[in-house]
Amino acid sequence: MQFPRCSGKNNYMDRIATLSELLTQDPNNAFARYGLAMEHSNAGDFARALDEFGKLLAANPDYVPGYQMAAQTLVKAARPSEAKSMLENGIASAQRKGDSHAESEMQAMLDEIGS
């Protein structure tokens, strides 16, 4: 699936609109849901980002990148205990999927938060 290129001052809103339209057509599109969560997170709208990450992970419990990025968003939102829990769940998911790279990245982040 290819997304249209957005240009100009309204890039953020254009990307939000495009991803929202994709989700209207297919609410189970994990890639679009992840993208929407990331757009909100990058814009500093942590509440919306975390809502989208929650929807993503509820529908796709082994979408490993979702855990890591949700945890990063929780850290940015000054919610470290929730970030730790998210990382623990993400590590378990990465282990189920055999994704040792993501597992080690999340473990490093967990260790950093724990200190």
Which stretches of residues belong to each language-model region?
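Canonical positions in the second alpha-helix
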Residues: 21-22, 55-56, 90
